[in-house]
């Protein structure tokens, strides 16, 4: 009786529960499914536009019924970085008799192997240069297990940036797997770097951007985010280091040897010493300064004194003639034009009856001597030819014929007027007490140079001096020279 009473009570309770709960129809289940999907999109992307990806699955946000039936907006004029997705067909809204409002249509997307999802491409947004719309609060491309994802691989070639997309296996990137050596699922799209504005920094927490040789790929989060503007000098090629160091001065190279052992070995190597010597020999070590000669003349008619300045910037250029009137009321130097061939002054000027005369010669062959005449009043220059046999240079050359017998022979050399002084490039060299060939009497030379009774004067000219970093084996001489 007790067991029968318990069974009857259970049957009565179950019957009462079944009678009180309404039966769920197919329409109610479908309505609940649609409401759940819409709530997911509204919670995750409250402010997103149309066709914004949800959970990297490709589900778009749900527009209103008027937006669904409205014609799509025209495509932008600029090309998209990634190929656009095909138009998604929308099913007509089903008729639900127990619904007050029609429910939103459910989009039908293509299968995943044929068209992989693009979690970072916004098809409705205007062209932004680089594909993704970045989320400032989280990863725009998270590594979620069991969800296939797309990873870009950027390749540089000239001024073009090639963007290729690779589909991962649905797991996070581990180690140094770059996805850059796998076959492409989509056709690459060349982008001109001059017109595309790339983001200065990728906002990724787990995936960072790294430069490896000629490719820019996405690496793992264990790599350091370095500044691309900083260049490691040790990573430069050896030949490039040699070129940079050869353009420094010898004093700077001496200090740079203390930077590292590698730099010290490079600077001290014979190959670098030869390269530095070759580079230094090509540079001019003898600067050219303009030679200025000034003459003062007097004009008895106008009772004025004027100064003539002749500047010789180079032998291959015309001379610069300037005139200054002394006491002329603040007038400065004035240029005067000389149409004749340039003649360089070689003698001291003499002022006679309103004219200034000085000896000169032509700097170009045949280098004829002339007498320059400057009219102080009219400020004009004229030339008077001089006889060629007036200016002659020569010297005696002693030649040692026999070393054992100490026999010498003498030769007298006479230069014609076409031969001028001893030249060092474009610079003339002469010394007091010597003739035009640089040879003179020892007593006269010592008297003009200040050596009257004691000592000798030795003049050493090294016009071909070239700076070098070669060192002597003697450490004392090395310290003195360096």
Curated annotation (Swiss-Prot):
Disulfide bonds: none annotated. InterPro entries: F-box-assoc_dom_typ3, F-box-assoc_interact_dom, F-box-like_dom_sf, F-box_dom. Residues 230-280 form the F-box domain. PANTHER family: BNAA05G37150D PROTEIN-RELATED, F-BOX DOMAIN-CONTAINING PROTEIN. It holds the Pfam family FBA_3. This is Probable F-box protein At1g30780. It comes from Arabidopsis thaliana. SUPFAM superfamilies: F-box domain. It comes from the Eukaryota. NCBIfam families: F_box_assoc_1. PROSITE patterns: FBOX.
């Amino acid at each position: 009786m007790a067991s029968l009473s318990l069974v009857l009570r259970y049957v009565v309770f179950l019957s009462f529960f079944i009678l009180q709960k309404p039966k769920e129809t197919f329409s109610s289940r479908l309505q609940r499914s649609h409401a759940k999907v819409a709530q997911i999109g509204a919670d995750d992307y409250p402010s997103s536009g149309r066709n914004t990806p949800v959970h990297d699955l490709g589900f778009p946000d749900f527009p209103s019924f008027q937006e669904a039936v409205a014609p799509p907006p025209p495509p932008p004029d600029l090309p998209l970085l990634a190929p656009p997705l095909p138009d998604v067909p929308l099913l007509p809204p089903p008729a639900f008799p127990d619904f007050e409002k029609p429910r939103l249509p459910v989009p039908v997307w293509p299968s995943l192997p044929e068209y992989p999802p693009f979690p970072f491409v916004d098809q409705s947004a205007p062209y932004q240069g680089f594909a993704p719309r970045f989320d400032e609060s989280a990863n725009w491309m998270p590594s979620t297990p069991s969800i296939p994802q797309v990873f870009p691989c950027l390749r540089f070639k000239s001024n073009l940036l090639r963007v290729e997309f690779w589909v991962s296996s649905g797991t996070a990137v581990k180690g140094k797997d770059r996805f850059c050596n796998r076959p492409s699922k989509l056709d690459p799209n060349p982008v001109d770097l001059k017109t595309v504005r790339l983001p200065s920094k990728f906002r990724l927490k787990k995936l960072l951007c790294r430069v490896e040789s000629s490719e820019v790929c996405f690496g793992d989060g264990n790599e350091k985010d370095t500044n691309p503007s900083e260049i490691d000098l040790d990573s430069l090629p050896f030949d490039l280091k040699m070129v940079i160091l050869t353009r420094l001065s010898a004093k700077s190279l001496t200090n740079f040897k203390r930077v590292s052992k590698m730099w010290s070995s490079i600077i001290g190597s014979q190959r670098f010493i030869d390269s530095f010597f070759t580079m230094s020999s090509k540079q001019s070590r003898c600067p050219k300064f303009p030679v200025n000669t000034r003459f003062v003349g007097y004009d008895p008619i106008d009772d004025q004194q004027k100064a003539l300045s002749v500047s010789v910037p180079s032998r291959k250029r015309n001379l610069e003639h300037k005139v200054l009137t002394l006491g002329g009321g603040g007038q400065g130097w004035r240029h005067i034009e000389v149409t004749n061939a340039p003649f360089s002054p070689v003698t001291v000027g003499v002022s006679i009856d309103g004219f200034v005369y000085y000896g000169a010669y032509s700097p170009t062959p045949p280098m004829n001597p002339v007498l320059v005449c400057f009219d102080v009043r009219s400020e004009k220059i004229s030339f008077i030819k001089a006889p060629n046999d007036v200016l002659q240079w020569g010297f005696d050359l002693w030649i040692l014929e026999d070393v054992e017998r100490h026999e010498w022979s003498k030769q007298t050399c006479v230069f014609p007027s076409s031969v001028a002084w001893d030249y060092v490039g474009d610079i003339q060299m002469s010394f007091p007490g010597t003739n035009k060939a640089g040879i003179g009497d020892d007593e006269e030379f010592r008297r003009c140079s200040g050596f009257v009774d004691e000592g000798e004067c030795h003049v050493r000219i090294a016009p071909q001096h070239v700076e070098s970093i070669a060192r002597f084996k003697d450490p004392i001489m090395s310290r003195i020279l360096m």
